[in-house]
Amino acid sequence: MKIIYMGTPEFAVPCLEMLIDSGHEIVGVFTQPDKPSGRGQKMNRTPVKEKALAHNIPVFQPHTLRDTNVMNEIENLKPDLIVVVAYGQILPKAILELPKHGCINVHASLLPKYRGAGPINWVIINGEKKTGITTMYMDVGLDKGDMILKEEVEIGAEETAGELHDRLMHLGAQVLRKTIGLIENNEITAIPQNHSESTYAPILTKDLGKIDWSQSAIEIKNLIRGTIPWPTAFTFYEGQVMKIWKSTVIESELQEVPGKIIDVKKDCILVATGQNILSIEEIQFSGKKRMGVRDYLVGNAIEKGNILGE
């Protein structure tokens, strides 16, 4: 089968690797344009571009797909199928209708829940116990197409968004392999989504990581887990930004001002919340290394009674 692959970040690499290893003819890879990054503003290739070039696959990096020349390029490649994984651009109707077998997408949630760009983070932030991968046919709506396969996984109680991301990107490749097998054998029974059950997972912003201490300890812990590795949950201690990387919920009937440091132990900081106590175990101040509270307290002080967030 002749396939065009569209993807950009690290999450999209295992699916491309699987297609290459399975012997499909990848006639072209579409990925986002290179972006400058770092102090020298050096142009960085996307992870998908790196993988495609390593296998001598033609790479296309249009700023938009809504362009006649781009449409002609795609048409000339004569794809039987277009596979889209975290590409970062909306496909216009003309492209969706081009391949014989349509366009399919690998999405990192159990649709119709968590449509959008940030499903991996939001399932953890919202305290979900399970998530998974859904493959679907694409239509003009955002993640609204008919579903092909779903595979479910449990979310670990301590699992971070970064760890879940790495698990799901490999699961995505497995589910894509099964999906393409069904397409090749003409065995697909696509299921429409129940749009009334849909939820949305918007892309994350830096401000999302700011901790509201009036929330319960478990809600704050979920925010911490769900924003690792980026943007990372943070608060303020004596005017300095303090990122929090690891925490534990301690059940308590204590009624205190949310955000108040109620105790400082040798390896943790105990903080009052809207419900229960949060034990902070790993922190990072601006310009400093991430470290355990035990190590931080060797040469620094955290004062009991201070209010975090001020």
UniProtKB/Swiss-Prot annotation:
GO MF term set: methionyl-tRNA formyltransferase activity
InterPro entries reported for this sequence: Fmt, Formyl_trans_C, Formyl_transf_N, Formyl_transf_N_sf, Formyl_transferase-like_C_sf, GART_AS, Met-tRNA-FMT_C, Met-tRNA-FMT_N
Any Pfam family the entry gives: Formyl_trans_C
Binding site for (6S)-5,6,7,8-tetrahydrofolate: 109-112
EC number(s) recorded for this UniProt protein: 2.1.2.9
UniProt keyword terms in alphabetical order: Protein biosynthesis, Transferase
One term under GO cellular component: cytosol
Domain of life: Bacteria
SUPFAM superfamilies, per the entry: FMT C-terminal domain-like (SSF50486), Formyltransferase (SSF53328)
Catalytic activity: L-methionyl-tRNA(fMet) + (6R)-10-formyltetrahydrofolate = N-formyl-L-methionyl-tRNA(fMet) + (6S)-5,6,7,8-tetrahydrofolate + H(+)
Stretches assigned to coiled coil: none
Keyword Iron tagged: no
Protein role: Attaches a formyl group to the free amino group of methionyl-tRNA(fMet). The formyl group appears to play a dual role in the initiator identity of N-formylmethionyl-tRNA by promoting its recognition by IF2 and preventing the misappropriation of this tRNA by the elongation apparatus.
Family: Belongs to the Fmt family.
Name of the protein in its database record: Methionyl-tRNA formyltransferase
